[in-house]
Curated annotation (Swiss-Prot):
Membrane-topology descriptor: Multi-pass membrane protein
Membrane-spanning ranges: 5-23, 38-60, 73-92, 127-149, 170-192, 197-217
Disulphide linkage map: none
Main location: membrane
A cellular component term, taken from the record's GO annotations: plasma membrane
Keywords tagged on the record: Cell membrane, Membrane, Transmembrane, Transmembrane helix
Organism: Archaeoglobus fulgidus (strain ATCC 49558 / DSM 4304 / JCM 9628 / NBRC 100126 / VC-16)
Domain of life: Archaea
Cell compartment(s), UniProt: Cell membrane
Stated name of the protein: Uncharacterized protein AF_1499
Length: 234
């Protein structure tokens, strides 16, 4: 918990504040165009929510592991990434990907439905800032995850070499889980956008989760097997 709180307070939350301060339009998905427009309560909830959700996630995962439901604890973080990517890709009205790929500091124009920079966003001010933040965000998380997993396997009675091998596999499977969550979000978004009914978003999410469960998450599924072996679950 101490390591998590340090990571959140020293890296994650400061980065979120930086993005909100430098790109308030992009960080709020273009709901507001400047800091002066954003309600103070929203900023407070945004900053505290970043830390609170991480702590709640840690607490829930710990409760699941202590009750012997290790696999459910892993499903939780995959579900979190799915929700994260789905918000970016779909948003609340199907335009999330357009909002994400629009940087008013480059275009000089506020976002409107239908506007997107497409591949030009990759060289935008927002994108360059995200690239700069990637190293201090991802490296400590990957390195910390490896150390945490290795120490955990050693405490469970495994020798150092076996513990290190499983820790590497665990990190690789974590990255695989993130990628699967991204694919699920993309599929849910595509399905939702092809449905014209008001329930399109819900249908897209349900269909995606159902297919993902059948292919990957059920007992004996691809991801379930990988998680069980990679994290040495019994």
């Amino acid at each position: 918990m101490a390591a998590l709180l340090f990571y959140i307070s020293a890296i994650f939350v400061p980065e979120a504040i930086w993005l909100l301060w430098s790109f308030p339009h992009w960080e709020t998905m273009h709901v507001w165009n400047s800091l002066s427009e954003i309600p103070t309560a929203y900023v407070t909830a945004f900053i505290s929510g970043d830390a609170l959700l991480a702590v709640i996630g840690f607490w829930v995962a710990a409760k699941l592991i202590r009750s012997g439901r290790d696999y459910a604890a892993h499903i939780q973080w995959i579900a979190g990434y799915f929700a994260f990517f789905f918000v970016l890709a779909h948003g609340w009205d199907g335009t999330g990907w357009q909002r994400f790929t629009w940087d008013p500091t480059v275009t000089g124009m506020p976002w409107e439905p239908g506007r997107t920079m497409w591949v030009d966003f990759a060289t935008s001010n927002v994108a360059i800032t995200l690239y700069a933040m990637a190293l201090p965000t991802i490296v400590p998380m990957i390195a910390g995850g490896y150390i945490w997993l290795r120490n955990g396997h050693i405490l469970a009675g495994l020798d150092g070499a076996r513990a290190s091998s499983l820790a590497v596999k665990g990190v690789a499977i974590y990255l695989l889980g993130v990628f699967v969550a991204f694919l699920m979000a993309a599929c849910a978004t595509v399905i939702s956008l092809h449905l014209t009914t008001q329930a399109g978003m819900l249908v897209g999410v349900i269909v995606t989760i159902t297919v993902a469960y059948a292919l990957a998450f059920r007992r004996g599924g691809i991801l379930q097997t990988a998680i069980s072996r990679g994290f040495n679950l019994t």
